[in-house]
Amino acid sequence: MRYTVALTGGIGSGKSTVADAFADLGITVIDADIIARQMVEPGQPALNAIAEHFGSELIAADGTLRRRALRERIFSHPEEKAWLNALLHPLIQQETQRQFQQATSPYVLWVVPLLVENRLYQKANRVLVVDVTPETQLIRTMQRDDVTREHVEHILAAQATREARLAVADDVIDNNGAPDAIASDVARLHASYLKLASQFVSQEKP
């Protein structure tokens, strides 16, 4: 198994910006959200199953999934959310495993928004948390997704708390300031992770 750094953070924290900075340094990034989106692209069996289960009104005219409509449907129906998770989780795990096997960089950055909620931090060698204040999360998400404050507050209430994420963190990037500051933080952590990955490999050898 390749040395794995799990990256997490709440909605609007800037996980993608941080992940992109690691990718620019040549690190393989495996993003659970991107994989989940790929699983429901037109032509994928999962999208057909969703249309069959929830109805064709969740499929747009161009054949793509109406994500917001699906989110609204499962938000107020826990049993529907459970059905969707049972459909997608095995597919996501399978694709994640495939990408890990194909990774070539000294360590892998595994981006998992629900790392704490699903207790997946146990599968990583190290946990990196992108930390921002809840108010920053609200403002950024409202601007990015063009949604109401109330909508974002509902999402925040369903996610792990800031304290719960920080409790499992080995490293923290404070992303409350300007995005430019991220590059230096990532460069510093990258140097540290290269050393840790090298030690990990030497310990793994018989």
From Swiss-Prot:
GO terms for molecular function: ATP binding; dephospho-CoA kinase activity. Pathway: Cofactor biosynthesis; coenzyme A biosynthesis; CoA from (R)-pantothenate: step 5/5. It is found in: Cytoplasm. GO terms for biological process: coenzyme A biosynthetic process. Keywords: ATP-binding, Coenzyme A biosynthesis, Cytoplasm, Kinase, Nucleotide-binding, Transferase. Pfam families: CoaE (PF01121). Its EC number is 2.7.1.24. The keyword Nucleotide-binding applies. Disulfide bonds: none annotated. It catalyses: 3'-dephospho-CoA + ATP = ADP + CoA + H(+). Its main location: cytoplasm. InterPro entries: Depp_CoAkinase, P-loop_NTPase. CDD domains: DPCK. ATP binds at G12, S13, G14, K15, S16, T17. Residues 4-200 form the DPCK domain. One of its GO terms (cellular component) is cytoplasm. Belongs to the CoaE family. Catalyzes the phosphorylation of the 3'-hydroxyl group of dephosphocoenzyme A to form coenzyme A. HAMAP family: Dephospho_CoA_kinase (MF_00376). This is Dephospho-CoA kinase. It comes from Salmonella typhimurium (strain LT2 / SGSC1412 / ATCC 700720).
